[in-house]
From Swiss-Prot:
This is 26S proteasome non-ATPase regulatory subunit 2. PC repeats lie at residues 412-445, 446-482, 483-517, 522-555, 562-583, 666-700, 701-735. Disulfide bonds: none annotated. GO terms for biological process: hyperosmotic response; proteasome-mediated ubiquitin-dependent protein catabolic process; regulation of protein catabolic process. Keywords: Proteasome, Repeat. Residues 16-32, 40-59 have a biased composition (Basic and acidic residues). Belongs to the proteasome subunit S2 family. It comes from Dictyostelium discoideum. Acts as a regulatory subunit of the 26 proteasome which is involved in the ATP-dependent degradation of ubiquitinated proteins. Pfam families: PC_rep (PF01851), RPN1_C (PF18051), RPN1_RPN2_N (PF17781). GO terms for molecular function: enzyme regulator activity. One of its GO terms (cellular component) is nucleus. The keyword Acetylation does not apply. It comes from the Eukaryota.
């Protein structure tokens, strides 16, 4: 196209007037601008012309043919119009079968969309009009308006199969159905026409690797139950995995309904272990019992379900399967753990000095020897936990180690024996027995606590903890009573035994005892009846808080509040009545109780509104000692949910900069709760900085949390940090916490975890959370509780301890070493096909240790696991279809 001529004016000669010069310059600038604009327009025109000219002969022909068909579609003769429309359909279908780029027919017809709409409006009723509606429905995808024309014209169309228009069309249609459904529901209009389309779309999506889209559509139109008729062997796992993850982002009670659909699908496909996991997630005892009934004739599956329930530390209601009672009771956990220790060659006991890797400076040892001996006792217990022997407390030659401690230090030192012999009832009781009848009261009290620790998570027909501890509940010595009651709380956490309620609940009414005793009674009852929502016990707690009045604000009263909160752990709306009742309690005690109950009720849910409530409480402008509890509550609510945890880190960063002293003291503890036994570098760096803070309580909390996030991992980086801190705080009270953290880091010589999440991080163990919360609530007043007389509360962590192993057994429950691949787990939610679930794997022979983010899969096809998640104790059965070259097949032949 020829460029337009532009005339540039020549300025007149002569005349030096400034105003005229300015005027001339202005005119020149305007003309130059006009010239530039004209040149740009010319360039655009040239590009446009060039683009039009570059159409290939085939494209040019297609464009002309389509324009001709559009023109003929307005023909008055229906036969001609219908033929033209059918030809248009053929052209569009041939291009929409693969939507890798914008199809050319849609591109060329886009400019004719309004023309076709006018033709439709002016057409008479008949086949031609409905056929044109089908075409308009497809073209509306490229139109880009918000009128939902794709759905509108689909409903007006001929009703032909949507599959013929391709996947992209179906996806677009499903999106518009979701929006239209909400609008019609608000206006109380019929949605039958939409549901008919849904019944057509869902089968198409389910058979074309689009299960997530099918689930989304059914969720939006509230018809999720229809998914059952489309489930088969090929798609059930992807559907359930997607629905399970969706439940995190759906408010109640819809989240429970989604999870129940998952359970029904798993039961339909006979995936009973997976069904049981989801039922435990819902925390529905009836559903759990029903699943057990379905497999009562299948011994191997029944045993595998028993191992899953034992890991969660719960007992199903009306349980009467004697054949697996040993499994449910965790009776053989010690045996399996010792097999792991033997295989890893780590049974030899370690001394605390081997963990410290440097002897204490002589001057500091003399200045605070009793305190450092106490620290060594804790470290010895943590490091040798579960191995049955150590070099300080259970050695054959009596070292009299406990004599090197003073008063309550003796209690904790003797109690540490229970952690060394953890889970081994037969062998452990004999090693504790020698302390039980000592004339030294602190020694015998420590033995009572040790018995409780020994049987934590283990059930036995002999019931040794109850028979040995019950007689001391009404002792005249308060220390003895506290030891026995705390021991019972650790031993029977999560059992919800009514005989223990009748035994312990009268202790709450004891007016003669101080708040420390009442607090420990409340904590023990909370641990035993964790998540039970027991109304009788809840009422008793509230009455005690009211009766105690101002004493309910004392430091140890926090454990009474925590006990009440634990009753509602994870129960969400079930805690509303208790929260309303607590509003009647005025003062700081009532406020602490309300915050604790609300946080416990929504533990691990990631509930954004509750997190906002806690943040709002922190920002009220007044310096409130309970701000620290609100910070800890944020971590409790967000834990276990990856996105929420990341958001918490950012919140805590802001709170560190702007918050008051109570907030700053709680943040290290909150970080420890957010990531136990999972040493994330971001958290590690924050805690490393805070461990040098000028406020001693901030520094001590940070040091303790370094131990919590690295617990049982032997993490080299944290180990280096703690050794440096031991030198830095060589003559300081902080050294006690450095030693505790070093002991936690090497928990069980690196074989245990305190993280409450298991089964590929999908299930939260309430008992494990309870143990962590007991320690962290004590940490909120670290100066007056953990640093002084109540250091025995460090042992509450025993409720959270569990071997982080994968052990494979045959159908006779004998160890069966097999090759497994262990690597970083990969999020495969919403991915089509069968993608890899791990990356960067290494091949090992079971038993093996698994890290927080690690997952395992069998590296051989000789066996089939009875559960899809290889974690903890897994039963394998021989694969009847094993390849001929495999060792198992050769052995059979």
């Amino acid at each position: 196209m020829p460029q337009k001529e532009v005339t540039i004016p020549v300025p007149a000669k002569g005349g030096s007037n400034k105003e005229e010069d300015k005027k001339d310059n202005k005119d020149t600038e305007e003309k130059n601008t006009t010239t530039n604009t004209t040149t740009k327009d010319n360039k655009k025109d040239k590009k446009k012309d060039k683009k039009e000219e570059t159409l290939s002969p085939e494209d040019e022909k297609l464009k002309n043919d389509l324009e001709l068909l559009v023109e003929r579609s307005r023909d008055e003769k229906e036969e001609i119009a219908l033929a033209a429309l059918e030809a248009l359909k053929t052209e569009i279908r041939s291009s929409t079968s693969s939507m890798t780029s914008v199809p050319k027919p849609l591109k060329f017809l886009r400019n004719h969309y309004s023309t076709l709409v006018d033709i439709y409006k002016n057409s008479k009723e008949g086949k031609a009009k409905t056929s044109l509606a089908d075409i308009l429905s497809v073209l509306a995808m490229a139109n880009g308006n918000d009128e939902r024309d794709t759905l509108k014209y689909k409903l007006l169309g001929s009703g032909e199969a949507i599959a013929s228009w391709g996947h992209e069309y179906v996806k677009h249609l499903a999106t518009e159905i979701g929006v239209e459904y909400d609008i019609k529901k608000e206006e109380n209009q019929s949605v039958e026409d939409l549901l008919k389309l849904v019944d057509e779309i869902v089968p198409f999506q389910m058979t074309h690797n689009a299960e997530p889209e099918a689930c989304d559509l059914l969720l939006e139109v509230e018809q999720l139950s229809k998914i059952f008729q489309y489930i088969d062997e090929n798609n059930y796992s992807r559907v359930c995995l997607y629905l399970f993850k969706c439940s995190y982002y759906v408010p109640g009670p819809d989240d429970i309904n989604i999870l129940k659909v998952c359970v029904e699908i798993y039961i339909k496909m006979k995936q009973y272990p997976d069904a049981l996991r989801v039922a435990m997630k819902i925390s529905d005892p009836e559903l759990i019992t029903e699943i057990f009934k379905l497999v009562e004739n299948n011994k191997s599956i029944l045993q595998q379900l028993g191992f899953l329930v034992a890991r969660q530390k719960i007992v199903p209601d009306n349980f009467n399967y004697d054949s697996i009672s040993d499994i449910i009771n965790n009776s053989k956990l010690s045996e399996y753990f010792m097999n792991l220790a033997t295989d890893l060659d780590i049974r030899e006991p370690k001394l605390p000095e081997e963990i410290f890797q440097s002897h204490l400076d002589s001057t500091s040892a003399i200045a605070d020897s009793a305190r450092m001996n106490l620290a060594s006792s804790f470290v010895n217990a943590f490091v040798n936990a579960g191995f049955g022997k150590d070099k300080l407390m259970t050695a054959e030659e009596d070292t009299k180690w406990w004599f090197k401690n003073r008063e309550l230090g003796i209690l904790s030192t003797v109690a540490s024996t229970g952690m060394v012999v953890l889970w081994d009832i037969d062998g452990g009781l004999t090693k504790i027995d020698k302390f039980l009848y000592s004339q030294e009261k602190h020694c015998s009290n420590g033995a009572l606590m040790a018995i409780g620790m020994l049987t934590s998570g283990i059930r036995s027909e002999m019931d040794p903890a109850l028979s040995l501890l019950a007689e001391h509940i009404n002792s005249s010595n308060t220390g003895t009573r506290i030891s026995a009651i705390f021991g019972l709380g650790l031993a029977y956490a999560g059992t919800q035994r009514q005989d223990l309620m009748s035994l312990l609940s009268p202790c709450l009414d004891d007016d003669k005892e101080k708040m420390e005793f009442i607090g420990i009674v409340g904590l023990a009852l909370g641990l035993i009846f964790i998540g039970s929502c027991d109304p009788e016990l809840s009422t008793l707690f509230v009455q005690t808080l009211i009766q105690r009045g101002t004493a309910a604000s004392e430091s140890h009263a926090r454990f009474l509040h925590l006990g009440l909160g634990l009753l509602y752990l994870g129960k969400q709306d079930a805690a509303e009545l208790a929260l309303e009742t607590l509003k009647a309690i005025e003062g700081k005690g009532g406020e602490y109780a309300r915050l604790t109950v609300e946080a416990c009720a929504y533990a691990g849910t990631g509930n954004v509104l509750k997190v906002q409530n806690m943040l709002h409480f922190c920002s009220d402008g007044q310096e409130n000692p309970h701000h620290g509890l609100a910070v800890l509550s944020i971590a409790l609510i967000a834990m276990g949910e990856e996105l929420g945890s990341d958001m918490c880190l950012r919140m805590f960063d802001h709170l560190l900069q702007k918050g008051n002293v109570h907030i700053k003291r709680a943040i290290p503890l909150a970080l420890g709760l957010l990531s136990p036994s999972n040493p994330r570098i971001a958290i590690m760096d924050i805690l490393s900085k805070l461990s040098h803070d000028n406020d001693p309580e901030v520094a001590q909390g940070a040091i303790l949390s370094l131990g919590l996030i690295g617990a049982g991992t032997n993490n080299a980086r944290i180990g280096g940090m703690l050794r440096a801190l031991a030198v830095f705080y060589g003559k300081d009270v902080h050294l006690f916490f450095v030693r505790i953290a070093q002991g936690l880091l090497h928990l069980g010589k690196g074989t245990m975890t305190i993280n409450p999440y298991h089964s590929d991080r999908t299930l939260m163990s309430p008992v494990a959370v309870g143990g962590l919360l007991a320690l962290l609530h004590a940490g909120l007043d670290i100066k007056n509780i953990l640093s002084t007389q109540s250091h025995y509360l460090f042992f509450s962590i025993v409720c959270s301890m569990y071997p982080r192993m994968l052990m494979t057994l045959d159908e006779d429950l004998k160890p069966l070493p097999v090759s497994v691949r262990v690597g970083q787990s990969v999020d495969i939610v919403g991915l089509a096909g069968k993608p890899k679930t791990i990356t960067g794997f290494q091949t090992h022979t079971t038993p093996v240790l698994l890290g927080y983010n690690e997952r395992a899969e069998l590296a051989t096809d000789d066996y089939i696991p009875l559960t899809n998640i290889l974690e903890g104790i897994v039963i394998l059965k021989p694969n009847p279809n094993a390849s001929v070259t495999s060792p198992l097949a050769s052995k059979k032949n």
